[in-house]
Each structure stands twice: as structure tokens, then as C-alpha cells.
Amino acid sequence: MAPAASGAKKQKKKWSKGKVKDKAQHAVILDKSTSDKLYKDVQSYRLVTVATLVDRLKINGSLARRCLKDLEEKGQIKQVVGHSKMKIYTRAIGADE
């Protein structure tokens, strides 16, 4: 019984307060400057996903998905992986087609 009692004297772990992440204020509507940046810069990206557009252009996820669909219809990007949760695109190169 003595060894069990000595184990209880261990100091309790103090919990940290945790970090609070600021809420992102990303654009919900595609304005002219963001649209120009999208069409110009996306040709240099090797990997294009919703997350890359959200991170680089500061737009929200639903807008990024619509942009990807539009870029694919215009032939600027092509789909590499189509999954129910994530679609991965790459830049379309004329020699591939």
C-alpha cells in the first residue's frame, strides 16, 4: 500500500491556455484585381488545389472551388486527381494534349 500512496504525490500537470487563432477575413466575391491575379498567377503553379488558392489569393473555399471549375473549362488547368473530398489540378501544357 505504501508504494501506491507515494505515486499520488506526483505534481499535477498544469494545462496551458491554448492558442487562439484569428478568424480569417477572406474575400467572398471575386473582384477585378483578384481575378487578374488568379488568371495570371495560376499558370505558374505546378499544383493547384482549393487550399493553394485560399492561401495565396485570400478567397474563401467555395469561391476557390468555382474558380477551379472555371479555369478547367477555359483549359488553363487540367485535373490530375478527382476525389469526392479534394480535386487536384496542374497547369495545362499545350504539348501534353
From Swiss-Prot:
Q: Does the keyword Transferase apply?
A: no
The record's section on InterPro entries has:
Ribosomal_eS25, WH_DNA-bd_sf
Give the GO molecular function terms. structural constituent of ribosome
KW Cytoplasm (keyword) present:
yes
Signal sequence range: none
> Keyword annotations for this protein?
Cytoplasm, Ribonucleoprotein, Ribosomal protein
> Where along the chain is composition biased (Basic residues)?
9-18
According to the record, the residues making up region (Disordered) are 1-24
Instruction: Provide the Gene Ontology terms for cellular component.
Output: cytosolic small ribosomal subunit
Compartment(s) where it occurs, according to its Swiss-Prot or TrEMBL record:
Cytoplasm
Q: What is its main location?
A: cytoplasm
Summarize subunit and interaction data from the UniProt record for this chain: Component of the small ribosomal subunit (SSU). Mature N.crassa ribosomes consist of a small (40S) and a large (60S) subunit. The 40S small subunit contains 1 molecule of ribosomal RNA (18S rRNA) and at least 32 different proteins. The large 60S subunit contains 3 rRNA molecules (26S, 5.8S and 5S rRNA) and at least 42 different proteins.
The cross-references to PANTHER family, in alphabetical order and at most eight, read:
40S RIBOSOMAL PROTEIN S25 (PTHR12850)
Described function: Component of the ribosome, a large ribonucleoprotein complex responsible for the synthesis of proteins in the cell. The small ribosomal subunit (SSU) binds messenger RNAs (mRNAs) and translates the encoded message by selecting cognate aminoacyl-transfer RNA (tRNA) molecules. The large subunit (LSU) contains the ribosomal catalytic site termed the peptidyl transferase center (PTC), which catalyzes the formation of peptide bonds, thereby polymerizing the amino acids delivered by tRNAs into a polypeptide chain.
Q: Which family does it belong to?
A: Belongs to the eukaryotic ribosomal protein eS25 family.
Q: What is this protein called?
A: Small ribosomal subunit protein eS25
Please give the organism.
Answer: Neurospora crassa (strain ATCC 24698 / 74-OR23-1A / CBS 708.71 / DSM 1257 / FGSC 987)
Tell me the classification of the organism that encodes this protein.
Eukaryota, Fungi, Dikarya, Ascomycota, Pezizomycotina
Q: Which gene encodes it?
A: rps-25
